[in-house]
Amino acid sequence: IYDRKHSAMAEYDFSDVDLGALLDGFDWLHLSGITPALSPNCSKLVLDMLRVAKEKGLTVSFDGNFRSMLWSWEEARDFCTQCLPYVDILLGIEPYHLWRDEDDHSQGDVKDGVPMQPSYEQQDEIFQRFVERYPNLKCIARHVRYAHSGSENSLKAFMWYDGHTFESKLFTFTILDRVGGGDAFASGLIYAMLHDYKPM
């Protein structure tokens, strides 16, 4: 699924694309951390789009989506550090330890480097440190998975918004397909914010 070397997306030269015109008429830009991992061209495109979007006053959401098959933890962290000053809504970046100075992290998939199933207090502390370091953030959200078996999981979400950390109830369900779960969470959050839903 990550065999994207030498794909049209990875190899394309975006330097001739008028990003300002491309974003005309839009209020919101959502980007994924998978795109910049594909090639230097793609990482430059993402940073350029972030800058142009903020210049045009768009709301920007960013989902870190770290994939160890695409780039290293250090590469991902360095890139996301450049992105965060332009981001309003943040998803999927906690594994990078971007709220900390030290470089402690696990090998391989760094999702193992932070609590996979944090308490409310742990999550609130992480959110607060993020906001102190990146005061431009308006919302931070993550979902937490509890795997009971290969076919049954539970999910809940945490969100920091307007100075408060919120925790959802726990939902247990039978899995039909694991593909796109994080994207579904992101799209649901974006829809809710566009329609002024209350945090809970």
Q: Where on the chain are the PLM-derived regions?
A:
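Conserved N-terminal subdomain of the carbohydrate kinase-like
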Residues: 1-36, 60
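Catalytic-core regions built around general acid/base machinery
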Residues: 44-57, 79-86
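Conserved post-catalytic alpha-helical subdomain immediately downstream of the catalytic base
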Residues: 169-200
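A short helix->loop->beta-strand "cap" motif at the edges of active sites that frequently abuts
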Residues: 52-59, 134-138
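Hydrophobic faces of well-ordered beta-strands that scaffold small-molecule active sites
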Residues: 60-62, 90
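Short, small-residue-enriched loops and turns at beta-alpha junctions
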Residues: 8-10, 37-38, 67-71, 147-150
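Active-site beta-loop-alpha junctions enriched in small/polar residues
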Residues: 5, 34, 65-69, 95, ...
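Conserved phosphate/ATP/ADP-binding segment of small-molecule kinases
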Residues: 70-163
